[in-house]
Amino acid sequence: MSDLDIQIPTAFDPFAEANAGDSGAAAGSKDYVHVRIQQRNGRKSLTTVQGLKKEFSYNKILKDLKKEFCCNGTVVQDPELGQVIQLQGDQRKNVSNFLVQAGIVKKEHIKIHGF
């Protein structure tokens, strides 16, 4: 009999790309802002924004994002990733455009991940 290379599917980890490149560096030390989407139950999804500089007020940015896109959101403190902004729904393009127009980050420093 011959040995077959069988790949067993595993759970999708949306933060795998970010953790693979990190060599113990803290969140925010890189120049990139990562905008990701996470699938929840059914058609529901969650948009996460990670990597903003620490001198920004995350709560003020979140307040403007919630008001602009009519969605709910929160700031989560993660031990590995630092502060992460979470928004309901697929807001990846909206968030990236908002961050560029507000002058928070340059367009070439935003990485959009997801489907």
UniProtKB/Swiss-Prot annotation:
GO biological process, one term: regulation of translation
Keywords: Initiation factor, Protein biosynthesis, Translation regulation
Pfam families, A to Z: SUI1
Tissue: Expressed in all tissues examined.
Taxonomic superkingdom: Eukaryota
SUPFAM superfamilies to which the protein is assigned, alphabetical: eIF1-like (SSF55159)
PROSITE patterns referenced in this protein's UniProt entry, alphabetically: SUI1
Molecular function terms from GO: translation initiation factor activity
PANTHER family xrefs: EUKARYOTIC TRANSLATION INITIATION FACTOR SUI1
NCBIfam families in UniProt: SUI1_MOF2
Family that this chain belongs to: Belongs to the SUI1 family.
Function: Probably involved in translation.
Protein name, as recorded: Protein translation factor SUI1 homolog
Organism, as annotated: Oryza sativa subsp. indica (Rice)
